[in-house]
Amino acid sequence: MEKQRRSKGEAGGRGALPTYNSAVFKTVRTILLFAIFLIAGYAMATGGCADFSSKLPNVRAPLCEAAGLLDMQARSVKGRTIWGRDVAAADAGLRVLVIGGIHGDELSSASMVFHWIALAKQPMADMPMPVHWRFVPALNPDGLFSTPARRTNANGVDLNRNFPTPNWSRDARVYWESRTRKDPRRWPGPRPLSEPESRFLHGQMDSFKPNLIVSVHAPYGVLDFDGPAVPPSRLGRLYLDQVGIFPGSLGNYGGIHKRVPVVTIELPNAGRTPQDAEMRQMWLDLVRWTQDRLGSGPVEQQ
């Protein structure tokens, strides 16, 4: 009897497991799940703007939220959303794909795309060939939101060397080893289109079928061009300086192989955007060139 009494006393003492009211537990769980749902819903509704506005130069929350970014139904290596926005005239005859943030540490490239979305939404009087613009501000969100931001994606791949140019398997690794001395920032990856981010952009080229691709980079302060059509001589203060092609690059694949003109903008500073007026002038120059050189009809594609 004594042992039984002691056992019962111990069972109710310090070593006993606490008991929970199941109704309270269910209520707390429901509240937590609802809170998580609200947070996720807010992030989706604002297009990830809390993250963008805290990371990018010259991108405040109102600018980002006004962009109205949508989930492009694509994810990075780490599962981050790739956001985009279409600005399209009802009778658009041209399709232009604008990409920023291919390299995550080129923050200004993503910032300028946000400013261009705002400009694209403003009506323009002199546009005989209306345009369907598709903007992707940050193709490489894992690189962008790393601390510090880094050029490559989460797998350490330079996305601008991962496109399936002819003889990629032969040329890309040779170039990386001999010309860059195995620079890890420029590793082309184990195979072409090995990365979800480059596969997404490749898919956009196939499905959206752009007449022009604009790829925004930094920090070399020049304007590059690959493909058919007469290139723009300048955009704002950036002058044409064709620097050549690289195995696996978007310019090589899109402009040379697929025959889709690729304008590559190299902003002069990766951490700071040009002045707003300068970004506007670059936009106006791009629109005028698009109308002058591409407005007569689509460029032949392969």
Regions found by a protein language model. Give the residues of each.
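Short beta-strand-to-loop junctions in surface cap/lid or active-site-entrance loops
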Residues: 84-92
